[in-house]
Amino acid sequence: MVSIIICGRAPQINPDFSANIASTIGCEYEIIYIDNSRGEHNIFQAYNRGAQRAKGDTLCFSHDDIRFHTKGWGAIAERVVAETGGIVGIIGNQMMPKCEASWWTAPFKVGIITHHINGIVKTDNFLPFRHPCEPSATTHEAVTVDGLWFCMPRSLFGQIQFDEETYNGFHCYDSDICMQAIVKGHPVTVVCNIDIEHFSDGHLTNEFFEQRERWFAKWEKYLPVVRGISLSAQEIEIINQMAREANHWTHETAIAQEEIRRLRNTIAYRLGKKLLHPFSTTKH
């Protein structure tokens, strides 16, 4: 059985999402919905408590803003989890460099995801690095996966858990649990035959960068980590340097975007917009 653990922002699960799960999963399942509408839990606490209540042999941690398009995805997840004994997701990266990186900032992304970014629907299909002639492969070894959806055997959760002591928010739970698995000798796998649509893109806040600093401090001695690809020592060092530069500019850009969002919420901005466009109903 698959135990689907969801930390929700509403008191109850969205009926449309519940119906989507029921019509696509294709195996026995249960939904463990953690009501976090009052913000009583961070994601680490919520997922740990959900996993402790789970009855299934396969634990599935899921966002509440996704839609499944693959029929029988639950059976696929059960099979790959049983075969690998590790963490399974739909998109991730085959390298984590020696810096404060995220799966989506490192260079060797793998997997398929459809997501909504600023109102635009986009599908990213990342072929495995140096394996362009194997696009039909359905599983690929990785270092970390995105937290929008991932699974693991319940037996593995007895060895690793979401780190409530190091972190206190809603970021880095995915990359941290993956590093725990890797350090203990368990694989991380990306499956390319489960089609999921993600409806939010999120924002890079100060909390995100703070949590990522904690992640790097915890795992620095194990980095870099490479899985599923072969890289020379020189290539790894070049990638480390490139990743550090990319992280710097990502942080600077995020700070600027956060300031813009803050200004747009001020009374002065809204008043100025009204004075400049008194009859406009368009959002700026």
Q: Which ranges hold each PLM region?
A:
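N-proximal low-complexity "stem/linker" segments adjacent to membrane-targeting elements
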Residues: M1-S23, I32-Y33
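Glycine-rich, basic loop-to-helix element that forms the pyrophosphate-binding segment
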Residues: R38-A54
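Conserved donor NDP-sugar-binding/catalytic core segment of glycosyltransferases
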Residues: E40, R67, K71-H116
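Short aromatic/hydrophobic "clamp" motif used to bind/position activated sugar donors
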Residues: L59
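A recurrent flexible, glycine/aromatic-enriched loop bordering the glycosyltransferase active site
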Residues: N118-M152
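Donor nucleotide-sugar recognition loop
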Residues: V143-V145, R154, G158-M179, H186-E197
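Active-site donor/metal-binding and catalytic loop motifs
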Residues: H186-E210, R214-K218, I236
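Boundary detector for helix-to-coil junctions that initiate low-complexity/charged tails
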Residues: G228-H284
